[in-house]
Amino acid sequence: MKKNGKDGWNLFEQLKKNEVTVAGANQEALDPVVTGAKDMVIAGVDYMTYSAKAKGEPVDIVYPKSGTVISPRAAGIMKDSKNVEGAKEFIDYLLSDDVQKQISKAYLLPGRTDIKAENRPNVEEIPVLNIDWKTVEKEQDEIGKQFKKVFQ
């Protein structure tokens, strides 16, 4: 929003005028598209759409040429963990060939670059927005308030 300033907020205003709604959870956002009640979902999670498409639903995904946000599913070890070795073993398990292949089969992006997604674009094939996350963090309250103002 900051990079495009007023143009970004104008886009949201136009979306609101076209009866764009802010849905709740991911499936709640996708279901109206699957049933035909809505024409599209913006910013939905892609893995659910790939799954619906594989089941024969008339849906597809288009990543904007300008880029999108990829939200990794992180796993980490707390510095105060009581069982660091067990936690390391669990992380190793999550990053194992078998689990990473299962992740790929669930239409999620593998966390390792040597394991490729078989049924969706890999992370390097998806255009990604260059986001200044420190600025987003500093301005998230202001942006959230403005977003609510537009869509309420």
Report residues per predicted region:
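A bilobed periplasmic-binding-protein/Venus flytrap-type ligand-binding module shared by bacterial periplasmic
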Residues: 1-2, 72-83, 102-103
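Ligand-binding pocket segment of bilobal, Venus flytrap-like solute-binding proteins
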Residues: 1-64
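Solvent-exposed loop/turn segments at secondary-structure junctions
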Residues: 46-49, 66-69, 82, 97
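Flexible, solvent-exposed loop/hinge segments that line or gate ligand/substrate-binding clefts
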Residues: 59-68, 73-76
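Substrate/cofactor-recognition hotspot
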Residues: 90
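Periplasmic-binding protein-like
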Residues: 93-117
